[in-house]
């Protein structure tokens, strides 16, 4: 058994977190999680039933958060410190389930800590407003004060595979910062980073009812997560087709959709070609090319196209790749065979 597989077993990351409770798989309802590079089975996660999904929303909806701004900032700051303490464990977990090289995984773990710190700072900003009422001849000399309240319902969050913990952090941290409750479904391909992140937040003092992590087959549980009567907001990062499906199913619920990009690198005739070629290579290969901000098109002025192309080819040949666990490699693998064929 690999060290990561043992870490998963030791921390019971093969169980969902429903209101903080560890919920394992029922009979014949487990999803295998494979290391994309070695095809090693590093563990399983439950294939949630509709009853388990409904339980998560019921627990979240029944809980009424009472955390002060000070409380929320303290939780996020402590979680940031815990991420730093466990940074190497997190990086190896990210790398093993996603195939990202360890360099990229270490960077991602550091970014998670950053986002926690940013969230803690935002919590302390007063988001109330004051409006004067004597602005017209009908007005009176008085003022209206406003303050923001948490949603009445629950947030559904659905995250992709390409940044197993950082994408999760960008959903969960704003929810915690605003005293909301969330049911999160990470990609079934990379579930462990999300579950471990939830555990770190619980350890930092987050009431477990404020965050549940559900794993499962989207074909079985996605509609329930989109249409459950307790859902007030849906936030999704992923592909355009699924985003359109969510928008169609969500009805009058609030939705936040991040649906990829179509990012060009534009190189003009007076560009610094050394810098431009660096950006082209890094933008194409960092994170195994699996980023919404990855370079997808290069528009190069004809007068510098040949020289630019030579530089890109030269730097591509120097880009090291292979075993994601090798610290000398700059690129690991993509998430699965289907992704590799898509790239080809």
Where are these regions (language model features)?
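Terminal low-complexity tails and localization/encapsulation signals of metabolic enzymes
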Residues: 1-44, 74, 78, 126-158, ...
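Residue-level signal for inorganic ion chemistry
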Residues: 39, 72, 94, 116, ...
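Glycine-rich loop-to-alpha-helix module at the N-terminal edge of alpha/beta enzyme cores
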Residues: 42-127
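Hydrophobic face of alpha-helices
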Residues: 57, 73-80, 91, 113, ...
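Generic non-transmembrane alpha-helical segments
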Residues: 78, 82, 86-89, 196, ...
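Short linear capping/connector segments at secondary-structure termini
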Residues: 93-100, 131-138, 326-332
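Rossmann-like NAD(P) dinucleotide-binding subdomain of oxidoreductase/dehydrogenase enzymes
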Residues: 128-275
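ALDH superfamily catalytic-core signature
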Residues: 241-344
